[in-house]
């Protein structure tokens, strides 16, 4: 499904842990890393596509994550001319993406890159929040920068809530006398 401007509707997924690190996934058989992403099927909402891609690419279900935010607008990137398939109709010149920020609520051991018949990724790791902006392939950098700027406040709030829980002593306080 390509829109009238030549862009394929797509969802992107940023998964974070309680420390504010983000999941960085290695493309299958390559040394190229990125966030999970995938196309939106006809008749599918962006949120439905996100949950489908979440399972297909990292083996997680709705119960395993919590949605913290989504981008207000569609973000676009153009493919380099060498990657455009000029012989297909309609020609896809890039992607327009709706991004979702998810908090991992399950154990890391529940992540399964082999959950679909044709895996997109063969490895992953936690990286610092801004690391992907510097490391992603150059034509996606502007979109990644915009996504991470838009999602920084929910991530900071998450980190602060975790820090507050750690700093708060558990159990009743005893009165010293």
UniProtKB/Swiss-Prot annotation:
<feature type="short sequence motif" description="Nudix box">
    <location>
        <begin position="38"/>
        <end position="59"/>
    </location>
</feature>
<feature type="domain" description="Nudix hydrolase">
    <location>
        <begin position="6"/>
        <end position="149"/>
    </location>
</feature>
<protein>
    <recommendedName>
        <fullName>RNA pyrophosphohydrolase</fullName>
        <ecNumber>3.6.1.-</ecNumber>
    </recommendedName>
</protein>
<dbReference type="InterPro" id="IPR020476">
    <property type="entry name" value="Nudix_hydrolase"/>
</dbReference>
<dbReference type="InterPro" id="IPR015797">
    <property type="entry name" value="NUDIX_hydrolase-like_dom_sf"/>
</dbReference>
<dbReference type="InterPro" id="IPR020084">
    <property type="entry name" value="NUDIX_hydrolase_CS"/>
</dbReference>
<comment type="similarity">
    <text>Belongs to the Nudix hydrolase family. RppH subfamily.</text>
</comment>
<dbReference type="GO" id="GO:0034353">
    <property type="term" value="F:mRNA 5'-diphosphatase activity"/>
</dbReference>
<dbReference type="InterPro" id="IPR000086">
    <property type="entry name" value="NUDIX_hydrolase_dom"/>
</dbReference>
<dbReference type="GO" id="GO:0006402">
    <property type="term" value="P:mRNA catabolic process"/>
</dbReference>
<keyword id="KW-0479">Metal-binding</keyword>
<dbReference type="InterPro" id="IPR022927">
    <property type="entry name" value="RppH"/>
</dbReference>
<keyword id="KW-0378">Hydrolase</keyword>
<dbReference type="GO" id="GO:0005737">
    <property type="term" value="C:cytoplasm"/>
</dbReference>
<dbReference type="Pfam" id="PF00293">
    <property type="entry name" value="NUDIX"/>
</dbReference>
<dbReference type="GO" id="GO:0046872">
    <property type="term" value="F:metal ion binding"/>
</dbReference>
<comment type="function">
    <text>Accelerates the degradation of transcripts by removing pyrophosphate from the 5'-end of triphosphorylated RNA, leading to a more labile monophosphorylated state that can stimulate subsequent ribonuclease cleavage.</text>
</comment>
């Amino acid at each position: 499904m390509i829109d009238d401007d030549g862009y394929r509707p797509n969802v992107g997924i940023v998964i974070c842990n309680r420390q504010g690190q983000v999941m960085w996934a290695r493309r299958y058989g390559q040394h190229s890393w990125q966030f999970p992403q995938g196309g939106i099927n006809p008749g599918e909402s962006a949120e439905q596509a996100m949950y489908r891609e979440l399972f297909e690419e990292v083996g997680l279900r709705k119960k395993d994550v919590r949605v913290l935010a989504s981008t207000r607008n569609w973000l676009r990137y153009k493919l380099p001319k060498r990657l455009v398939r000029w012989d297909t109709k309609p020609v896809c010149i890039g992607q327009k993406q709706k991004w979702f920020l998810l908090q991992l609520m399950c154990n890391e051991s529940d992540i399964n890159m082999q959950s679909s018949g044709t895996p997109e990724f063969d490895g992953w790791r936690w990286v610092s929040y801004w690391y992907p902006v510097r490391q992603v392939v150059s034509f996606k950098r502007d979109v990644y920068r915009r996504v991470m700027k838009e999602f920084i406040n929910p991530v900071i709030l998450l980190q602060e809530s975790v820090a507050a829980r750690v700093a708060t002593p558990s159990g009743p306080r005893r009165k010293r006398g």
